[in-house]
Amino acid sequence: MRLLGLTVVLSVSVWGGAAAQTVPAPAPTARLSGAIAILEKHNKPSPDIGDAVIYLVSGAGTAARPVTMDVTIADKKFVPDVVVVPVGSTVRFPNTDPFSHNVFSASDPNGFDLGLYGRGEAKGHLFEHPGLVYIYCNVHSGMIAYVQVMPTRWFTQPGADGSFTIMGVPPGHYSLHVWHPRVAQEVVQDVDVPVAGLGLAQPVQLDARGFKWQPHKNKYGKPYPTNAGRELY
């Protein structure tokens, strides 16, 4: 009944000569496409090029709608080991191993400690701040994942061939950021996206030739014990 009454009032207003409101046309958007390439030692192919994250930064940008995503723990690994989520999203860490894990991060201001939990359990964390978050297990020193928390809605990851596309980009000036877990610093370049869209003429090049695995500390800020990861079933 309330819906019917509202309909009648609106009808009277329109027929009474009230000015009709014009719905503005949606702002035009464009597509940015390109590719990345990673320089490797001895010119070897990059097996993990799909772990890269590409995103656009603009002063007028807004974050996408928050999501909930699972990063599964299986065989002492985080799967997937790189995820990209908008600010305000929750990432859950279901444990499918037959032993316990303790997922944590010391990446402020997104640091957290989920404590020890066993097979069949899942715990998660709400990521309220943008930035790169390193994820570890306090039991197994070899476990690592990366959560990129995005303040922008324009982000993607490349395919196995390094190609990428970002859709729905309003025409304008942006900083294009490319990150990869084995590259020390993001590659950043300016791009101007016209109404017709933009295809980058050259691949964005990253250099992983100097990468070396660096051991990290446990959640107490101390080195892992030599027997870390030895399972007690």
Regions found by a protein language model. Give the residues of each.
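Bacterial N-terminal signal peptides
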Residues: 5-15
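Extracytoplasmic copper-binding redox domains, predominantly the cupredoxin/blue-copper superfamily
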Residues: 21-233
